[in-house]
């Protein structure tokens, strides 16, 4: 029969436990990193979806008020002042556009971090049909970058 010296085997169990704990810790850190990356991607997708909804919303408002013409044109981060009564009484097309833009801009600031908005009006080829280029920008969370989404609306 073979005799095993206990003195030679001492400490091996502790080393095995330390190696297993290290492997487990590395695995847990990798899992946490994946969760954080997934949450960041979900937040980015949520912001892109909100921006697409904002573009669609203003596009529908422009289509619903074709008489407003250039009243929907706004420089970056500017909104015209809406009428004091917010069109609760009768309003012309330009006043309705001012209310639409003020509401839309307020909503953009509520759903997108660092929101910037702009609407440019053009008549390509010297024609009479107007095109509205709607732009929404926002700050990407956790980065010093901005995301941007544009749409062209032809009423």
Give residue spans per PLM region.
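Aliphatic-rich helix starts adjacent to a transmembrane/signal segment
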Residues: 2-8, 12-56
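Short coil-to-helix leader/linker segments, especially the first N-terminal amphipathic alpha-helix
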Residues: 1-4, 114-116
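Flexible, low-complexity segments enriched in proline/glycine/serine and punctuated by aromatic residues
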Residues: 19, 40-49, 53-155
